[in-house]
Design a protein with these regions (language model features):
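Short boundary/linker motifs that mark transitions into or out of structured domains
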Residues: 1-44, 100-108, 115, 289, ...
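Intrinsically disordered, charged and Pro/Gly-enriched terminal/linker segments
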Residues: 38, 74-78, 108-333
Length: 333
């Protein structure tokens, strides 16, 4: 997925355990024997697996699956063909997942356990955590949101056909992906990464020409880089694309942003909670750790001095910490 940004995802996307199914791209099954993902062969197999994963833990009636695989005008042999596809897919899942396969119910089929994990679940969890962290720590929010986007390998449920279940879920996930992408750039702006965001949003607005939020973020990024005229030019470009593409004018939020930029509204330059605050917090924490380490070193020096001087005849009382500190102050002063 070209929109996935280059945020580090080692601590957010790794170490969480493998998911049973991957749907953020071609649908795949995690093979517990080999530790790899495998894909069903054939378009109907992928469409069947996609539909069952979308409704994992729920009974899917045979009629609905027939409609998913063959549309409004299924062949007369669709019921028998569905049974054959289920049998082949069941063998694949039993080999890959063990007992967590397809079960036959009175009215249809159920895939595995209700809690079957997918990469879509992981994506939504990371995205939610990123949004929840945005106000307090935009740097961390950007890491989480970047990790969520890095899970995408292509179009959701790619190759699973255009049946209503798979197509509807793919559309829902794509909207969540774009919303997460927009929130990622909000986090970057809050963290003070204006020039970087302005460059990348130029490309993203070209790829998604009717996403007003992306234009809004690009205008703010450019303005904070001191490029007011370019920011206003983005508004005109957005307006033209919206009129040509959808036949509508920009919404109130984008118009308000244009007016604010035109009149240099103070709110545009009021710094959001940015990276400097969090970097300062990190620096303070590192300083505290260093002070503790120095204190331990000082205690070790005191013990060594006392050990060295204890055997010397006529030696006075042991060196005390306060005295050593005073000596250090005298040297520095």
């Amino acid at each position: 997925m070209d929109d996935t940004m280059d945020e580090s995802v080692n601590e957010t996307a790794a170490g969480t355990g493998e998911t049973d199914f991957r749907v953020l791209g071609p649908v795949e099954v995690f093979d517990r024997r080999t530790g790899t993902y495998v894909a069903p062969s054939g378009a109907k197999q992928r469409a069947l697996l996609g539909a069952l994963v979308v409704r994992a833990g729920q009974v899917l009636p045979g009629e609905r699956l027939i409609h998913e695989l063959w549309g409004e005008r299924p062949p007369a042999s669709a019921a028998n063909a569905l049974q054959a596809h289920v049998a082949r897919l069941r063998r694949l899942l039993q080999q890959a997942l063990g007992e967590d396969g397809i079960s036959t119910q009175a009215t249809g089929y159920t895939l595995g356990r209700p809690g079957a994990r997918t990469d879509a679940h992981h994506f939504q969890e990371l995205s939610s955590r990123g949004r929840g962290t945005l106000a307090a720590n935009p740097v961390r929010a950007a890491e989480l949101l970047g990790g969520a986007l890095a899970l995408w390998r292509g179009t959701a449920l790619e190759g699973s056909g255009q049946g209503p279940l798979c197509a509807g879920e793919a559309e829902r996930l794509e909207e969540l992906r774009l919303t997460t992408l927009e929130t990622l750039y909000e986090a970057r702006l809050r963290a003070g990464r204006h020039a970087e965001a302005a460059r990348e949003l130029e490309r993203l607005t070209a790829r998604h020409p009717v996403r007003e939020r992306l234009y809004d973020l690009q205008m703010l990024a450019l303005y904070r880089c001191g490029r007011q005229a370019e920011a206003l030019g983005v508004y005109e470009r957005a307006r033209r694309r919206l009129v040509e593409g959808l036949g509508v004018e920009p919404g109130p939020a984008l118009r308000a942003r244009m007016e604010a930029i035109l009149h240099h509204a103070p709110s545009l330059t009021t710094p959001d909670p940015d990276a400097s605050l969090h970097e300062l917090g990190g620096a303070i924490a590192r300083l505290g750790t260093r002070i503790e380490a120095l204190a331990r070193e000082q205690q070790g020096l005191i013990r060594r001095l006392n050990s060295l001087t204890s055997g010397v005849t006529g030696q006075g009382p042991p060196v005390e910490r306060g005295h050593l500190l005073e000596q250090g102050a005298d040297v520095e002063g």
